[in-house]
Every structure is written in structure tokens, then in C-alpha cells.
Amino acid sequence: WVRWVGPHENLGDLTYRAEFSGYEPVDGVWLPMSFNVVSDFRDNVQLRLHVDRYVLDGDVGDLAAPPAVRAAPAPTPAYTVDASVVAPGVWLLSGNGGANSVLLEFADHLSLFEVPTNRAWTAALIAKARSTVPGKPVTEAIISHHHFDHTGGLRTAIAEGLTIVTQAGNVAWFEDLARRKVEAFPDALSRNPKPIKIRAVDDHLKLSDSKLTVDVYRVVSNNHMAHGLMAYVPEHHLLIQGDLFDVGWEVYFWGNTYDDNVAYRKLEVERDVPIHGRVLPIAEVHAKLKEQTRNAEQLCAKVESVNLSMPGCPLAWND
């Protein structure tokens, strides 16, 4: 076996162990016909490979990088963040570094909905929030759910002193992420350790002052995410969400979950403000959801026709 340590945006120092098996002679050399790579995070299998054939001493050409490339330092990601006004006190932060975040301006502080993708992108988002509304501190980050693409900047947010607003079911998990060892590949939090500050939401949290009101709700009736949150800005009829809908998806397996959440909370949504995608009027959201769901139905039918199964099939929804 071989063991090594690599960096992970969410998990910090991740130890991998590759185990080799099924050795067979190939041109006089005993070589493994399969190997399995497991990480030290819950013994998660990262890669399992079975070899079809080997080629020994084959011509692979010159694989060396040019001298100038070998001598150059590793590039620093150059991120550009755009702040688009959605409504007074609400901006969509988007750009070339990853998923969106949403900036919310209160009377004496700023909040972000989502710290996504990775640490560097989240640092750029926080910097953009501060420059968009100078003089007000960014004090909290509302996180839609625990998936890695939505929490890639969690450790950066903690290092910046932000309070993490999350559904109560995520608290232990986020505390675990904050405690992960990050020594081989240090980040902002390992260089400047701080305790995680969490504000847990059970079902509903109202954030309100003289400038802005935001209702944070637990997501119901959704089998994509556990312990999810969405936010509603009643004054401007905005729904802020991560993974309840994405205009870029081709299929949608979750039936009426979007409208179920809106109806359950008695919201009057006029525009959707997504973490993935672009701001859309609710009529376009409904039209796209219907198209995506019908595409999912067709996919399920194809899968069933060859006697296979797929998670999410058959669909249950009301047209």
C-alpha cells in the first residue's frame, strides 16, 4: 500500500491510502490488476480501478514540462466578483470563481447567503461585500446546506470571524469541519485559529432591523439535501435558495418541492435568487421546472425500458 496527504477545501489535510491487489506477471514484472484508494474521512472510497491491460516500456514521448514552466511559481487564482443589484439592500455576487453568494445589507452590518466553492473564492466574495458597502462589517454567513460546493468557504468564513447561520442538523458536522487538521497545507483558519460561532435555526429565523427583513426557513419536502435553509425577503418578494432550482439543470427529480416550500411558508415570490444560475422571475422558474421535470420523466422511462433503476425514478409530481 501507499499513503499520502493531500489538500481538501472542506476537510483540510486528507490522508489517502492506496491498496493494490490481484498481482499478475506482465513481461516478467508482477503488477496489480486493481487498486482501491480510501481517505481517512469516514473511510470514504475515492477511487477504485480495475486494469484491463498494461503496456511496459512503451513510447510516451517527452513528458517533461518546459524549463520556464518548471521554474515559475504556482499561480494565484485571479477572481473577478461582480455585484449586481437585485433590490435595495440585496446584491447577487457572481463571477469567474464559482457559485453565487447573496449580499444582504442591514442597518449596521452585512450578511452573506452562502460561502461556496472554495476558500479563495469565498475570500474574494467577502472582500467584494466589504467594498460594495464600505463601512459596514460582514458579520454572518447563512448556509443553504452542507454539500461541499456550498460550504467550500466555511473555514474562510470562520477565520474572518463570521457567525455561521445553519439549520440545527448541521451544527455537529460544521463543528467537525472547523476542527479538522490543516497543517500540511495551511489555510486562513489554521494560520489564525478561531472558534466557530454558530447560530442554529430549527424551523424559522427572522433577521430584521430598520433597513431590511429576511426570513430564514428550513427547507421541507426535498430529498436532495438534509437540513437545508432558504431565505425570503418579503419587501421585495425574493426567494434566495441553493439547489432548490438551477436554470442550468437538464432534469429535475424532486417534483413539486420548490412550490411545496413556497406554499408551506405562504410566500409571495416574484423572483428567484439562486446560488447556481441567474435571477429569474417566478414565471420563468415555473416554466423551466416543468421542462426539467418532463425531461426527467423521459429519462426515467428510458432507464425503465432497459430494466435498470435510477434514484429519483419514478417521479411523483403534479403538473
Question: Where on the chain are the PLM-derived regions?
Answer:
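Zn-dependent metallo-beta-lactamase
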Residues: 46-107, 205
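Conserved beta-strand hairpin/beta-sheet module of binuclear metal-dependent hydrolase folds
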Residues: 84-131, 228-246
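Active-site metal-binding motif and surrounding structural segment of the metallo-beta-lactamase
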Residues: 120-165, 200, 265-270
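Divalent-metal (often Zn2+) His-rich catalytic cores of metallo-beta-lactamase-fold enzymes
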Residues: 156, 259-318
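Metallo-beta-lactamase
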Residues: 160, 169-220, 265
